[in-house]
Amino acid sequence: MLSFLAALSLPLALVNAYANPGTCNGNCWAHDPGLWKHDDGRYFLFSTGNGIHISSAPSLQGPWTEVGYALPDGSSINHDGNKNLWAPDVHKGDDGKYYMYYSVSTLGSQNSVIGVASSTTMEPGSWTDHGSTGLSSDGSQGYNTIDANWIKIGDQQVLNFGSYWQGLYQIDLAGPLKIGTAAPVNIAYNATGQHAIEASFLYQQNGFYYLFFSSGKANGYDTSFPAQGEEYRINVCRSSTGRGDFVDKNGVSCLQSGGTTVLASHDNVYGPGGQGVLEDNGAVLYYHYAPRNGDLSVSSYQFGWNRLNWVDGWPTV
């Protein structure tokens, strides 16, 4: 186990490059967070684990209270990992319902399924599980079907997904519950190392679609943290269509290991990632991170958020 002193010994160069996270009070634990604001002003935070943890708060600052699980009995999908769901992505549909996409898998596996549930309130006990979206992988494809992210491009609902292997993909939906018939399209790939790229999140701003994603080692810092710069970090590419041709600030294609870093380790923040963007009087980048003054285990992860600034058409914190 990495000791407290070892955690403090992480490179002191990891400071002062980025703004510190916004204030968080109450139960601020989070892992691969999904975030949505209810019409009544309350914020709902969803996290990986069991039947998807739900916390709520009257403001982004909190105080946050864990209130239960979205699917306390797990998923109806008959697949390994269906009692320990990952990477929730929540949005409000045109029909007024809230939809949550989740992943069913096990660590290191490419045998994965993306499921979906719906609710009229986002409260624990209100979620109906609809099972699989029809999007799955078994190792014979180039992709891994986890980390779903929904967006509407024009009139078309799409899911972005993927983790490691051949990277990030996009597929059209036939509706909120099922995928369409078209094949997934590869939109980002990391050719370096172990191809560490995941947690795609697509956000529209000022005529562009910004593809946020996490690169680097996501966890295990409490037993063996990576070389400086190889831990989780948040990168971005952009496209004018949202359907491909994503490039970073230097013009490097996201299919050729491109990606401009938006947020990396600094000060007390180590390995930020699993991110999304909430429109809340401006764009709010949210994520989890491991506090450097803690034990760096997943159980110590914290909810982080920063308001995004836009400089020459690119997001900064």
Swiss-Prot record:
Give the protein's recorded name.
Probable arabinan endo-1,5-alpha-L-arabinosidase C
Q: What is its main location?
A: secreted
Q: What class of enzyme is it?
A: hydrolase
This protein's gene is called: abnC
Q: What does this protein do?
A: Endo-1,5-alpha-L-arabinanase involved in degradation of pectin. Its preferred substrate is linear 1,5-alpha-L-arabinan.
Recorded hits in InterPro entries, A to Z, give:
GH43_arabinanases, Glyco_hydro_43, Glyco_hydro_43_endo_a_Ara-ase, Glyco_hydro_beta-prop_sf
One GO cellular component assignment for this chain's record is: extracellular region
Which residues of this protein are annotated with the site description Important for catalytic activity, responsible for pKa modulation of the active site Glu and correct orientation of both the proton donor and substrate?
Answer: D147
Q: Name one GO molecular function term.
A: arabinan endo-1,5-alpha-L-arabinosidase activity
Q: Which residues are glycosylated?
A: N190
